[in-house]
C-alpha cells in the first residue's frame, strides 16, 4: 500500500501489490521553495536544506520494502478493518526517524500516487506514496516529531470513509487494551496526546517550508551556522546564497533554487554544534506571510542558543612597582555576574586585546550578550587607594603582563582532523621507507614543457610526482589498496589526494583518475583544487575519497619527514626538498652535481608488506629519473 520515493537508488524488486518509484530532483515538485547546496555539489538524489540530507551514497536494498511491508495489518476486532503503518528502517544504519511533514490530513482521501508523508532518516528524506486508494483515519505521530524508533506505528488508514469516525479517539494504548481482553469499563480515560504548542508549526501558519540542517558529509553529526547571507524579510531569488554552514569537512554555501522570502531565522549566526535535522529557518512563498512567523519557535530549537566561546580567564593586573606590604589588604572589586558569560566573538577578541575582565562588563545585546559597543564604552573601576601605612621596603615583584595567551575555539574541521589523525596513529601499524631520487631529468623536461605552454600555464615538479605516483600504483596495486576490516580492497583506478594547508586546517582535494591524465591536465586540476581549498569552496565530492595521498613540504625547505596515513588508504608519500649533491660519474672529474629529492613512504603493514613498499618506491623512482617512461 505504500511505496518509498527517494533518489540515487539503482534497483528495488517490488513485492506483490507494491512498487518503488524513486523521484528525481531535476524537476522540483510543486510547493514551497526548495533550497539546494552549492551548485558544484553533485545531487546524489539529495535536497540539502529542504529536508534532503547530503552525504551518503549508500543505496537502499530490497529489504527496505520488506521491512516497510513485512508486518501484516494488525486488526482490532472492536474496530473496523484498518491498516497500521509502521516506521520502517529506510537505511542500513537507521534506528530512528523524523516525521518531516504529513502531506495528507485526517479524513482526506488518498489516491494512487499521492504523497502521504516525508520521513527524514539518517541518510535522506524519504517520501511515502500510496499505490491503492484509501482514507487517512488517524495520524498517531505529529508532524515534526523527532527520533521516532523504527517499527513505531505512525498512522492508521482505512478502506471506507465511513470507518474514519471510529478512529477519532484512537490511541495505541486503547488499541492494545482492546486486543488483550474483552470490552470492560476503563478505569480512567487514556491521556490525550499533548496538543502542539502555539509556537509549534501547525495549520494556523501560512504555507511555509521549514529548512533543516542536513548531513553534508558521511561523518557529519553537527554543524556550525557560520553566516547568514540573507536577512529576515528579504526576497530570495534563484541562485542567491542563503547561508554558509561549517561542517566537519569544509564550509559549504547553500543557494536558493526557487524564489521565496526568508520569514524567520531559527538558529542565529555563529551557533556551533547544531545537531542534524535541527530547523534552521522558515521560507514562505508570499511576502505578506512573513509577519505570521514573527514569534515562530519550533520546539526543536527552543533551547538552542549561540554558544559562548570558552570563558577568557581574567587577565592578571600588573602589579605596581612599589614595596609590597607584609599584610596586604585585598581591595574591594565589584563582583561580576555569576555563571556563564555570553559574549560575541568580536567582543571577546577586543576584550582580550584590551585586557578587560568580561565579568565586569554589562551586556546590552540580546539576552544580555556582550557586544562590541559594550567593550568600546567600558570604563574599568578604579582600585581602592593603597593603605598609607608605612612598611619596610621589600623586594620588587616583577609585573605580570596582561593577556599572555588566547584561547582559540576549535573548528569542526580541526576537531575532525584531530580525531582522524589520532585514530590513524592508534589503529594503523605505520612503517616508513625512504629513498633519494635524482630529479635532473624531470627538471629538464619540465623546462622544455613550460616553454611550449607559455601563456597557458605551468607544470610543477609536484605534477610529475603525482603522475609518477599514479603509474607506480598501477604497477604495484597493493599500494593502491584500502583496509576494510574484513577485506582488503584493491582499487583499479588511482585517485591521488594532495594535502593542502588552509587557514581552517589540512584538507586533501583529489585528482581523480590521475593515471590516465596528462601533466597539463593534472597541473590545471591541482591549481583549481588548491585555490578552492584555500577559499573554503571545495565541494564534498572533491575531497572525500582518494586511494593514495601525497604530502609535499619540500617547498618549505623540509629535507624529509614521515606523514600520517589517511585511512582507509594504505600509503602516503612525504616529499622533501631537493638539494644539490655530488654523485659518481664517468667523466674527467669523476663526479657530477645532481638535484636529489628525498621521499618517505608511510605504509599500513596490514596491507603493504615491506618488500611491496620497496617495490613501489623503485617504480616511482624509475619514472622520475627517466620521465620519458611515463609515456609507455
From Swiss-Prot:
The modification Phosphoserine is found at residue 91. The keyword Acetylation applies. Keywords: Acetylation, Acyltransferase, Carbohydrate metabolism, Glucose metabolism, Lipoyl, Mitochondrion, Phosphoprotein, Repeat, Transferase, Transit peptide, Tricarboxylic acid cycle. GO terms for cellular component: mitochondrial matrix; mitochondrion; pyruvate dehydrogenase complex. Its EC number is 2.3.1.12. Residues 82-158, 208-284 form the Lipoyl-binding domain. The modification N6-lipoyllysine is found at residues 123, 249. Part of the pyruvate dehydrogenase complex (PDHc) that is a multi-enzyme complex composed of multiple copies of three enzymes, pyruvate dehydrogenase (subunits PDH1A and PDHB, E1 component), dihydrolipoamide acetyltransferase (DLAT, E2 component), and dihydrolipoamide dehydrogenase (DLD, E3 component) to which is added an additional protein the E3-binding protein (PDHX, E3BP). In terms of structural architecture, the E2 and E3BP components assemble into a 60meric central core with icosahedral symmetry. The central core is decorated with E1 and E3 proteins. This is Dihydrolipoyllysine-residue acetyltransferase component of pyruvate dehydrogenase complex, mitochondrial. The lineage of its organism: Eukaryota, Metazoa, Chordata, Craniata, Vertebrata.
Amino acid at each position: 500500500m505504500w511505496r518509498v520515493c527517494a533518489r540515487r537508488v539503482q534497483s528495488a524488486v517490488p513485492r506483490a501489490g507494491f512498487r518503488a518509484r524513486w523521484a528525481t530532483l531535476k524537476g522540483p515538485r510543486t510547493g514551497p521553495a526548495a533550497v539546494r547546496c552549492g551548485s558544484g555539489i553533485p545531487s546524489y538524489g539529495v535536497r540539502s536544506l529542504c529536508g534532503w540530507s547530503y552525504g551518503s551514497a549508500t543505496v537502499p536494498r530490497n529489504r527496505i520494502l520488506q521491512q516497510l511491508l513485512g508486518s501484516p495489518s494488525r486488526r482490532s476486532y472492536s474496530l473496523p478493518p484498518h491498516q497500521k503503518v509502521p516506521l520502517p528502517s529506510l537505511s542500513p544504519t537507521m534506528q530512528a526517524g523524523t516525521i518531516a511533514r504529513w502531506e495528507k490530513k485526517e479524513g482526506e482521501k488518498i489516491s494512487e500516487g499521492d504523497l502521504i508523508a516525508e520521513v527524514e532518516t539518517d541518510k535522506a528524506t524519504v517520501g511515502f506514496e500510496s499505490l491503492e486508494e484509501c482514507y487517512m483515519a488517524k495520524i498517531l505521530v505529529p508532524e515534526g516529531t523527532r527520533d521516532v524508533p523504527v517499527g513505531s506505528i505512525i498512522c492508521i488508514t482505512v478502506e471506507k470513509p465511513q470507518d474514519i469516525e471510529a478512529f477519532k479517539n484512537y490511541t495505541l494504548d486503547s488499541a492494545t487494551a482492546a486486543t488483550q481482553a474483552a470490552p470492560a469499563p476503563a478505569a480512567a480515560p487514556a491521556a490525550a496526546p499533548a496538543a502542539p504548542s502555539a509556537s509549534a508549526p501547525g495549520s494556523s501558519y501560512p504555507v511555509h517550508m521549514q529548512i533543516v540542517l542536513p548531513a553534508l558529509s558521511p561523518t557529519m553529526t553537527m554543524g556550525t551556522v557560520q553566516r547568514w547571507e540573507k536577512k529576515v524579510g528579504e526576497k530570495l531569488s534563484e541562485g542567491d546564497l542563503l547561508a554558509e554552514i561549517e561542517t566537519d569537512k569544509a564550509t559549504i554555501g547553500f543557494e536558493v533554487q526557487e524564489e521565496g522570502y526568508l520569514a524567520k531565522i531559527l538558529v542565529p549566526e555563529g551557533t556551533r554544534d547544531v545537531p542534524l535535522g535541527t530547523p534552521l529557518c522558515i521560507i514562505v512563498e508570499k511576502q505578506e506571510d512573513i509577519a505570521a512567523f514573527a514569534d515562530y519557535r519550533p520546539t526543536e530549537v527552543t533551547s538552542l542558543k549561540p554558544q559562548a566561546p570558552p570563558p577568557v580567564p581574567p587577565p592578571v593586573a600588573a602589579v605596581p612597582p612599589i614595596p609590597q606590604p607584609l599584610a596586604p589588604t585585598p581591595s574591594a572589586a565589584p563582583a561580576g555576574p555569576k555563571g556563564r558569560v555570553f559574549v560575541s566573538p568580536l567582543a571577546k577578541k577586543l576584550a582580550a586585546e584590551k585586557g578587560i575582565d568580561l565579568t565586569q562588563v554589562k551586556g546590552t545585546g540580546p539576552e544580555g550578550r556582550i557586544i562590541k559597543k559594550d567593550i568600546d564604552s567600558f570604563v574599568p573601576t578604579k582600585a581602592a587607594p593603597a593603605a598609607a601605612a608605612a612598611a619596610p621596603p621589600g623586594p620588587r615583584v616583577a609585573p605580570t603582563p596582561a593577556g599572555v595567551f588566547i584561547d582559540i575555539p576549535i573548528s569542526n574541521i580541526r576537531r575532525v582532523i584531530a580525531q582522524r589523525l589520532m585514530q590513524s596513529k592508534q589503529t594503523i601499524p605505520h612503517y616508513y621507507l625512504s629513498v633519494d631520487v635524482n630529479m635532473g631529468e624531470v627538471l629538464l623536461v619540465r623546462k622544455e614543457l613550460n616553454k611550449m605552454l607559455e601563456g597557458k600555464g605551468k607544470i610543477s615538479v609536484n605534477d610529475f610526482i603525482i603522475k609518477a605516483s599514479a603509474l607506480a600504483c598501477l604497477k604495484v596495486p597493493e599500494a593502491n589498496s584500502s583496509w576494510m576490516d574484513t577485506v582488503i580492497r584493491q582499487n583499479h583506478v588511482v585517485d591521488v589526494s594532495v594535502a593542502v594547508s588552509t587557514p581552517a586546517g589540512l584538507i586533501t582535494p583529489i585528482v581523480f583518475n590521475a593515471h590516465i591524465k596528462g601533466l597539463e591536465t593534472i597541473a590545471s586540476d591541482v591549481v583549481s583544487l588548491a585555490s578552492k581549498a584555500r577559499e573554503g569552496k571545495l565541494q564534498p565530492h572533491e575531497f572525500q575519497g582518494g586511494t593514495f595521498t601525497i604530502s609535499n613540504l619540500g617547498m618549505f625547505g623540509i629535507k624529509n619527514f614521515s606523514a600520517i596515513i589517511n585511512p582507509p588508504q594504505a600509503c602516503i608519500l612525504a616529499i622533501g626538498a631537493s638539494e644539490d649533491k655530488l654523485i659518481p660519474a664517468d667523466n674527467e672529474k669523476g663526479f657530477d652535481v645532481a638535484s636529489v629529492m628525498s621521499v618517505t613512504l608511510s605504509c599500513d603493514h596490514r596491507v603493504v608488506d615491506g618488500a611491496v613498499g620497496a617495490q613501489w618506491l623503485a617504480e616511482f623512482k624509475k619514472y622520475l629519473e627517466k620521465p620519458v617512461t611515463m609515456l609507455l
